């Protein structure tokens, strides 16, 4: 039996990388998937891949840093499918490596706006729908940087710590309303973005893991399915770490 049969799954940043892997895995598990991504994203190829696996799917444009855009994307999802069962708040950006003392204010603010405030905007409108319909599941994509400092990435680290705090607050405040919220904390995952890093840097990331490799998007997607499905029905307010043993 498929784990997400007929569930409506809303995924921000779902057109590439980890988000796309999660969308494909959710579709394979029987879900109807909404890809929420930048309007500039070339989403037709992704929708074709999803359709080949079955179900109904939708692309909605979103800028997670804009509350009106987030509200409209969630509304479009509900208008099409009549409900929202599962939300994966995955959209985010990296940032330049920088000291704190010489970091431009605009760089700090942009990363916080997208990686933390953007998650808040999504959670807010997802919760409004969940409360109307009697429950739902939220999975927030955090990072290992939400659990430990990442040298040179202060705003990213601060934002991901904030995402974990927000996730726990959702769990505490809305558990009685049949809302579950959990987070995934991956280490570096093999995505096109990762391959933009210099080879020496990538090798240093690999050397830091006891497994001597980086994670794969499909491995994150499997974790998402676990947290999204009834397999994790008593899991609430926790973090699932995918790091190959880095935190040991």
Give the ranges of each region predicted by the language model.
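C-terminal substrate-recognition "lid" of short-chain dehydrogenase/reductases
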Residues: 11, 135, 213-242, 247
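Conserved glycine-rich cofactor-binding loop
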Residues: 15-16
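The beta1-alpha1 cofactor-binding region of Rossmann-like NAD(H)/NADP(H)-dependent oxidoreductases
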Residues: 40-41, 61-72, 105, 218-219
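Substrate-binding pocket helix/loop in short-chain dehydrogenase/reductase
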Residues: 98-100, 104-112, 194, 205
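Active-site helix of classical SDR
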Residues: 123, 159, 167
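Residue(s) in the substrate-gating loop at a strand-loop-helix junction
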Residues: 143
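Short, small/polar-rich loop/turn modules that mediate ligand/substrate recognition or access, typified
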Residues: 175, 180, 235-237
């Amino acid at each position: 039996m498929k784990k997400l049969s007929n569930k409506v799954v809303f995924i921000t940043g779902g057109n590439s990388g980890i988000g796309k892997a999660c969308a494909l895995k959710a579709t394979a598990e029987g879900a109807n998937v909404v890809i929420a991504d930048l309007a500039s994203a070339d989403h037709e190829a992704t929708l074709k891949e999803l359709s080949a696996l079955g179900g109904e799917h939708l692309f909605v444009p979103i800028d997670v840093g804009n509350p009106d855009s987030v509200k409209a994307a969630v509304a479009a999802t509900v208008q099409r499918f009549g409900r929202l069962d599962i939300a994966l708040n995955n959209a985010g950006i990296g940032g330049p490596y920088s000291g704190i003392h010489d970091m431009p204010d605009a760089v700090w603010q942009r990363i916080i706006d997208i990686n933390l405030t953007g998650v808040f905007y999504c959670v807010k409108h997802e919760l409004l729908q969940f409360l109307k319909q009697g429950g739902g599941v939220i999975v927030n994509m955090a990072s290992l940087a939400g659990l430990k400092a990442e040298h040179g990435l202060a705003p990213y680290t601060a934002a991901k710590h904030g995402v974990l705090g927000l996730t726990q607050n959702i769990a505490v405040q809305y558990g009685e309303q049949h809302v579950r919220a959990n987070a995934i904390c991956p280490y570096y995952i093999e995505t096109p973005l990762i391959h933009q890093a210099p080879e020496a840097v990538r090798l240093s990331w690999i050397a830091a893991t006891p497994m001597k490799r980086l994670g794969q998007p499909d491995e994150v997607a499997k974790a998402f399915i676990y947290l999204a499905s009834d397999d994790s029905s008593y899991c609430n307010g926790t973090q699932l770490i995918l790091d190959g043993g880095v935190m040991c």
